[in-house]
């Protein structure tokens, strides 16, 4: 008597499932996870890089106790924050208190999906890339606001409100500053913007847009001198004063991920992304090398600003944005539109 086989042959079933499209999806998922992991590692290493550079510029020793020349300080810091007590105060809104650092970390990493590291290396090639970045930046505002409100602490709440006002304001200038680049390229796709700079980087025709983008980028990432939401002398660490352990670590790493993100955007929008300077053709240097060198340069500029500039008052920060950055970006956009209309009316 012949028995009908109900359970299919597993190897053949899996083989039938592994089509070209399936392999493409798996490759994209693995590549995305690797890129996100590398971004987190780079952001963590930037913390030690910042401490060493600040020590060099201030003529003092940096971290030098763990490992040869302090090389294992990052490992020590990670172990310390991992084993710290992740304490949630009783008077907090526990759901919002836990959600805030997760949102901060997620939006920072998700924004990296649009960054083209080389012609073939990147998570997503979207025509709405820049719009996606602004969507994530808008959601990130809620992370700080949730953290400040849920902590039930007056310093946290003031820091959260400062952050919301500052970030929303400077995101306006951030968007207007790169609209000139979008107008010249005719696309929101970052890969298309990089490829359009093959004949010349946009730093020259969009110099004033770049200056405003730098200022707004520092303000949006809450870095010194625009670190008003967490001003230690005024707000006792601001919106994350009640956080500890891994929750604080997610806020902390998220801030440095945002620094890497803004540095990468400066590279792609104004400095040709992976393109070599002066159209140099050096076969043994991969395109990703030029991208990383440019991004590292801007990350160093963030650190230099922290070590050399004073923190202005909160009202001065807001006045500078609305009374200086906004007029500059509008004039830059109007001039760019006029030049395009006169010299490239069919663009």
UniProtKB/Swiss-Prot annotation:
EC id: 7.1.1.-
Membrane topology: Multi-pass membrane protein
PROSITE patterns linked to this entry: COMPLEX1_ND1_1, COMPLEX1_ND1_2
Main location: membrane
Gene Ontology annotations for the cellular component aspect, listed alphabetically: plasma membrane
Cellular localization per UniProt: Cell inner membrane
Catalytic activity: a quinone + NADH + 5 H(+)(in) = a quinol + NAD(+) + 4 H(+)(out)
Highest taxon above the source species: Bacteria
Residue ranges crossing the lipid bilayer per the database entry: 25-45, 95-115, 128-148, 168-188, 200-220, 251-271, 284-304, 324-344
Any GO BP: aerobic respiration
Keywords: Cell inner membrane, Cell membrane, Membrane, NAD, Quinone, Translocase, Transmembrane, Transmembrane helix, Ubiquinone
GO molecular function: NADH dehydrogenase activity; oxidoreductase activity, acting on NAD(P)H, quinone or similar compound as acceptor; quinone binding
Pfam family, one: NADHdh
EC top class named in words: translocase
Subunit structure: NDH-1 is composed of 14 different subunits. Subunits NuoA, H, J, K, L, M, N constitute the membrane sector of the complex.
Its job: NDH-1 shuttles electrons from NADH, via FMN and iron-sulfur (Fe-S) centers, to quinones in the respiratory chain. The immediate electron acceptor for the enzyme in this species is believed to be ubiquinone. Couples the redox reaction to proton translocation (for every two electrons transferred, four hydrogen ions are translocated across the cytoplasmic membrane), and thus conserves the redox energy in a proton gradient. This subunit may bind ubiquinone.
Family of this protein: Belongs to the complex I subunit 1 family.
HAMAP family given in the database record: NDH1_NuoH
Listed name of the protein: NADH-quinone oxidoreductase subunit H
Species the sequence originates in: Psychrobacter arcticus (strain DSM 17307 / VKM B-2377 / 273-4)
């Amino acid at each position: 008597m012949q028995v009908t086989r109900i359970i299919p042959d597993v190897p053949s079933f899996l083989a039938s499932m592994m089509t070209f499209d399936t392999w493409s999806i798996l490759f994209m998922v693995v590549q995305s996870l690797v890129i996100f992991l590398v971004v987190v590692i780079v952001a963590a290493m930037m913390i030690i890089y910042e401490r060493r550079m600040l020590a060099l510029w201030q003529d003092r020793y940096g971290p030098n106790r763990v490992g040869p020349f302090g090389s294992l300080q990052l490992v020590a810091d990670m172990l310390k924050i991992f084993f710290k007590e992740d304490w949630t105060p009783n008077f907090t809104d526990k759901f919002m208190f836990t959600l805030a650092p997760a949102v901060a970390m997620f939006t920072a990493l998700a924004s990296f999906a649009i960054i083209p590291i080389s012609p073939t290396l990147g998570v997503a090639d979207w025509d709405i890339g820049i719009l996606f970045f602004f969507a994530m930046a808008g959601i990130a505002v809620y992370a700080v606001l949730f953290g400040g409100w849920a902590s039930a602490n007056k310093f946290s709440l003031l820091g959260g409100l400062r952050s919301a006002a500052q970030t929303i304001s400077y995101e306006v200038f951030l968007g207007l500053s790169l609209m000139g680049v979008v107008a010249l390229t005719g696309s929101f796709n970052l890969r298309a913007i990089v490829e359009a700079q093959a004949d010349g980087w946009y730093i020259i025709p969009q110099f004033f847009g770049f200056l405003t983008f730098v200022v707004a980028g520092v303000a949006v990432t809450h870095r010194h001198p625009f670190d008003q939401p967490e001003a230690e002398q005024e707000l006792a660490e601001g919106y994350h004063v009640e956080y500890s352990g891994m929750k604080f670590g997610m806020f902390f790493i998220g801030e440095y991920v945002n620094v890497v993100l803004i540095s990468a955007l400066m590279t792609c929008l104004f400095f040709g992304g992976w393109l070599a300077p002066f159209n140099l053709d050096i076969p043994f240097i991969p395109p990703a090398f030029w991208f990383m060198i440019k991004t590292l340069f801007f990350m160093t500029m963030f650190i230099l600003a922290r070590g050399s500039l004073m923190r202005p008052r909160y009202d001065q920060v807001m006045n500078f944005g609305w009374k200086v950055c906004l007029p500059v970006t509008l004039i830059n956009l109007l001039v760019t539109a006029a030049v395009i209309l006169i010299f490239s009316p069919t663009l």
